[in-house]
């Protein structure tokens, strides 16, 4: 069992990583006998894990209600969020309740925002079931729903009480979802840790076949890196923005193509290559390193070009709504070398459009 702490003073919390955690009531600390829980999951995951998690909590004396939501990025919306509020109010659940997010990034983000909002804030626990949510979205307290004009535009910074990563969940993960998660894994190596990037080049095949020790190390290292960044910059005033490598371009793809048509990691993968191309055009990143990135993403089964349905010009309206924009000026996360990156303002639209054009599907 691996345990990492996100250090945020009174709001510090553990990330527990191991196989078989759904069998252990102690995995779900700080829950205790007599506590009230609303377990939030989706239609795909409910048949796989709902009864198991409910059972282990009830054996510990926890009172469990549940709400099952539709599955997909397109349901990460205010309308579906209201479904959670209605379920909480009908019981009713008070300020002493705990929301448990059992799912991937959509469930985690939406449930976290529900917890931040319901009665001005209740406790919640992240139980991520996808690789993407285990290495990234469950850690750090970013919660949100989407708006038709932009991804994650309505939300709050709100930290969980704990994160429970059961590696056994990956056994039921579709190959496309596994690849999507690997985009965020690869991102960490590019922005923060050259040695980890090299390790990924050497061990990607083991990750693709869900080798237990390799996957445990991979998730632990990503969570360590994320925890360090969040502890230093919880509200994304500086360092934490580096975690958005590829996301300014990727969010544009998701919004333009319709949420769910491109998985988040797929859009981020294409966006990472666009960011690398932009950095190349600015003379601060080598084409050889871009090729290393492309090769690793392709081996993971990820796209390295944007959708053919989008022109370069289609990206800009979405990118200009990005949360990093200041005074109407684009600010991009750009790689400087493998393991090193920066947030840069003043990147011209010409450079951005050229980088996108370099990555358009034929």
Swiss-Prot record:
Its EC number is 4.2.3.4. Its cofactor is Co(2+); Zn(2+); NAD(+). It is found in: Cytoplasm. One of its GO terms (cellular component) is cytoplasm. Keywords: Amino-acid biosynthesis, Aromatic amino acid biosynthesis, Cobalt, Cytoplasm, Lyase, Metal-binding, NAD, Nucleotide-binding, Zinc. InterPro entries: Dehydroquinate_synthase, DHQ_synth_AroB, DHQ_synth_fam, DHQS/DOIS_N, DHQS_C. Binds 1 divalent metal cation per subunit. Can use either Co(2+) or Zn(2+). NAD(+) binds at residues 71-76, 105-109, 129-130, 142, 151, 169-172. Zn(2+) binds at residues 184, 247, 264. It is an enzyme of class 4 (lyase). Its main location: cytoplasm. One of its GO terms (biological process) is amino acid biosynthetic process. It catalyses: 7-phospho-2-dehydro-3-deoxy-D-arabino-heptonate = 3-dehydroquinate + phosphate. GO terms for molecular function: 3-dehydroquinate synthase activity; metal ion binding; nucleotide binding. Pathway: Metabolic intermediate biosynthesis; chorismate biosynthesis; chorismate from D-erythrose 4-phosphate and phosphoenolpyruvate: step 2/7. HAMAP family: DHQ_synthase (MF_00110). NCBIfam families: aroB. Catalyzes the conversion of 3-deoxy-D-arabino-heptulosonate 7-phosphate (DAHP) to dehydroquinate (DHQ). Belongs to the sugar phosphate cyclases superfamily. Dehydroquinate synthase family. This is 3-dehydroquinate synthase. The lineage of its organism: Bacteria, Pseudomonadati, Pseudomonadota, Gammaproteobacteria, Enterobacterales.
């Amino acid at each position: 069992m691996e345990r990492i702490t996100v250090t945020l003073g009174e709001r510090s919390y553990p990330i527990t990583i191991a196989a078989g955690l759904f069998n252990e009531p102690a995995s779900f600390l700080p829950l205790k006998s007599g506590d009230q829980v609303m377990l939030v999951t989706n239609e795909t995951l409910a048949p796989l894990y709902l009864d198991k998690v409910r059972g282990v909590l009830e054996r510990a004396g926890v009172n469990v209600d549940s709400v099952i939501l539709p599955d997909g990025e397109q349901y990460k919306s205010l309308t579906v969020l209201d479904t959670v509020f209605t379920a909480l109010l009908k019981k009713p659940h008070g300020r002493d309740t705990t929301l448990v997010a059992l799912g991937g990034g959509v469930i985690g983000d939406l449930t976290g925002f529900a917890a931040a909002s319901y009665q001005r804030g209740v406790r919640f626990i992240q139980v991520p079931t996808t690789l993407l949510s285990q290495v990234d979205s469950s850690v750090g307290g970013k919660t949100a729903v989407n708006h038709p004009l932009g991804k994650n535009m309505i939300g709050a910074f709100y930290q969980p009480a704990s994160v429970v990563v059961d590696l056994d969940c990956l056994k039921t993960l579709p190959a496309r979802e596994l690849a999507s998660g690997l985009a965020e894994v690869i991102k960490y190596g590019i922005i923060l840790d050259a040695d980890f990037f090299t390790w990924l080049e050497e061990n990607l095949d083991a990750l693709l076949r869900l080798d237990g020790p390799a996957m445990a190390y991979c998730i632990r290292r990503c969570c360590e890196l994320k925890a360090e960044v969040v502890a230093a910059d919880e509200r994304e005033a500086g360092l934490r923005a580096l975690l958005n490598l590829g996301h300014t371009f990727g969010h544009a793809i998701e919004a333009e193509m319709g949420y769910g048509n491109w998985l988040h990691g797929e859009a981020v993968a294409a966006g990472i290559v666009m960011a690398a191309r932009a950095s190349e055009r600015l003379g601060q990143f080598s084409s050889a390193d871009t090729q290393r990135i492309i090769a690793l993403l392709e081996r993971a089964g990820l796209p390295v070009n944007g959708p053919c349905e989008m022109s370069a010009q289609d990206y800009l309206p979405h990118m200009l709504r990005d949360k990093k924009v200041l005074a109407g000026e684009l600010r991009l996360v750009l790689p400087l070398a493998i393991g090193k990156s920066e947030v840069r303002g003043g990147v011209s639209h010409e450079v951005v459009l050229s980088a996108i054009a370099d990555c358009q599907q034929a």
